[in-house]
Amino acid sequence: MDTSRKIIHIDMDAFYASVEQRDHPEFRGKPLIIGGDPNKRGVVATCSYEARKFGVHSAMPTRQAAKLCPNGIFIHGNMAHYVEVSNQIREIFSRYTDIIEPLSLDEAYLDVTENKKGMKSATMVAREIQQTIYQELGLTASAGVSFNKFIAKIASDFKKPAGITVVTPEEAEAFLEQIPVTKFYGVGKVTAEKLHRLGIETGADLKKWSEWDLIRELHKHGYHLYRHVRGRSNNIVNPHRDRKSVGKETTFEFNVLDSRVLEQSLMQFAKKVEERLIKLQKHGKTVVLKLRYSDFTTITKRLTLNEYTNDASQIYQAAALLLRESYTGQDSIRLIGLTVTNLKPVYFENLRLEGL
């Protein structure tokens, strides 16, 4: 395990909302919600910290957000402007290193082991980047500093907003032991529910399990979690990373025969895929359905649409059509997955912030 790398994860604080509050003084100090008209079927893209105090969060239906925060200010947002500001932030990063791996408009990994300024302390690099972003752009960022990407990302969320958390190799396991497993990068709702059923709530709980037992219960997730909680993750910062597909799949606790359960899973997946596509500023043209039967036979079916989309309803309709064509209801299903491929950058004027 290489512990000599110096990795920073920068995560902008409530990015879209903060840009709007910076540019529009009338929004400052008020609950601002970006996601469109609450009277329509939309989702929250992000919201200000003032709105979060009411329980509003990203991916929440705007109607629900309006009930939680009746005095909230709802706007559609300006994606082209957010991209412009994101590029300004990226330019600040590039003053320190060219090894930058963007995850979305508002977050990125930086490898500053050998940085352009010759600074020995990654902590000082992170602080300087935070200060520069604030001084030049009037925005705050949180930072996590560690020797691998997994820990750096968790650390960046530890002291939001405008915080910095440093985790050394010596501190890594103790730090991870206190973290709820729901905060582990890559642990989604389904995996979290499985972990909770196993009595695993924190990193400390996770460490009590053997590698074999975790793999038996969680398959590939178990393999990765066993290593992550011990600080064993050597994924490099990849400046050339480009997502070729966006998808979601789940293994059922019990084999499923009911097509309605399968369709419900596809609807949930479509919403999650839409959310990720919007964050990546991409849309796709090919929908792929994956089914694994109880005997472990696996099939994949795909449908190429007439136009590119990041719309959950269109993605779901295509996946549901593939399901009806593929599944007879005679054999039970162990796993179902939905993926959108054939991706390309979305034109800003067409980018959907409203969701469903």
UniProtKB/Swiss-Prot annotation:
<keyword id="KW-0548">Nucleotidyltransferase</keyword>
<keyword id="KW-0227">DNA damage</keyword>
<dbReference type="Pfam" id="PF11799">
    <property type="entry name" value="IMS_C"/>
</dbReference>
<dbReference type="GO" id="GO:0003684">
    <property type="term" value="F:damaged DNA binding"/>
</dbReference>
<dbReference type="GO" id="GO:0005829">
    <property type="term" value="C:cytosol"/>
</dbReference>
<keyword id="KW-0238">DNA-binding</keyword>
<dbReference type="InterPro" id="IPR050116">
    <property type="entry name" value="DNA_polymerase-Y"/>
</dbReference>
<feature type="binding site">
    <location>
        <position position="106"/>
    </location>
    <ligand>
        <name>Mg(2+)</name>
    </ligand>
</feature>
<keyword id="KW-0515">Mutator protein</keyword>
<keyword id="KW-0234">DNA repair</keyword>
<dbReference type="GO" id="GO:0006261">
    <property type="term" value="P:DNA-templated DNA replication"/>
</dbReference>
<dbReference type="InterPro" id="IPR001126">
    <property type="entry name" value="UmuC"/>
</dbReference>
<dbReference type="Pfam" id="PF11798">
    <property type="entry name" value="IMS_HHH"/>
</dbReference>
<feature type="binding site">
    <location>
        <position position="11"/>
    </location>
    <ligand>
        <name>Mg(2+)</name>
    </ligand>
</feature>
<keyword id="KW-0808">Transferase</keyword>
<dbReference type="GO" id="GO:0009432">
    <property type="term" value="P:SOS response"/>
</dbReference>
<keyword id="KW-0235">DNA replication</keyword>
<feature type="domain" description="UmuC">
    <location>
        <begin position="7"/>
        <end position="188"/>
    </location>
</feature>
<keyword id="KW-0963">Cytoplasm</keyword>
<keyword id="KW-0460">Magnesium</keyword>
<dbReference type="Pfam" id="PF00817">
    <property type="entry name" value="IMS"/>
</dbReference>
<comment type="function">
    <text>Poorly processive, error-prone DNA polymerase involved in untargeted mutagenesis. Copies undamaged DNA at stalled replication forks, which arise in vivo from mismatched or misaligned primer ends. These misaligned primers can be extended by PolIV. Exhibits no 3'-5' exonuclease (proofreading) activity. May be involved in translesional synthesis, in conjunction with the beta clamp from PolIII.</text>
</comment>
<dbReference type="GO" id="GO:0000287">
    <property type="term" value="F:magnesium ion binding"/>
</dbReference>
<feature type="active site">
    <location>
        <position position="107"/>
    </location>
</feature>
<dbReference type="InterPro" id="IPR036775">
    <property type="entry name" value="DNA_pol_Y-fam_lit_finger_sf"/>
</dbReference>
<dbReference type="InterPro" id="IPR043128">
    <property type="entry name" value="Rev_trsase/Diguanyl_cyclase"/>
</dbReference>
<comment type="similarity">
    <text>Belongs to the DNA polymerase type-Y family.</text>
</comment>
<keyword id="KW-0479">Metal-binding</keyword>
<dbReference type="InterPro" id="IPR043502">
    <property type="entry name" value="DNA/RNA_pol_sf"/>
</dbReference>
<dbReference type="GO" id="GO:0042276">
    <property type="term" value="P:error-prone translesion synthesis"/>
</dbReference>
<feature type="site" description="Substrate discrimination">
    <location>
        <position position="16"/>
    </location>
</feature>
<dbReference type="GO" id="GO:0003887">
    <property type="term" value="F:DNA-directed DNA polymerase activity"/>
</dbReference>
<dbReference type="InterPro" id="IPR022880">
    <property type="entry name" value="DNApol_IV"/>
</dbReference>
<dbReference type="InterPro" id="IPR017961">
    <property type="entry name" value="DNA_pol_Y-fam_little_finger"/>
</dbReference>
<protein>
    <recommendedName>
        <fullName>DNA polymerase IV</fullName>
        <ecNumber>2.7.7.7</ecNumber>
    </recommendedName>
</protein>
<dbReference type="InterPro" id="IPR024728">
    <property type="entry name" value="PolY_HhH_motif"/>
</dbReference>
<keyword id="KW-0239">DNA-directed DNA polymerase</keyword>
<comment type="subunit">
    <text>Monomer.</text>
</comment>
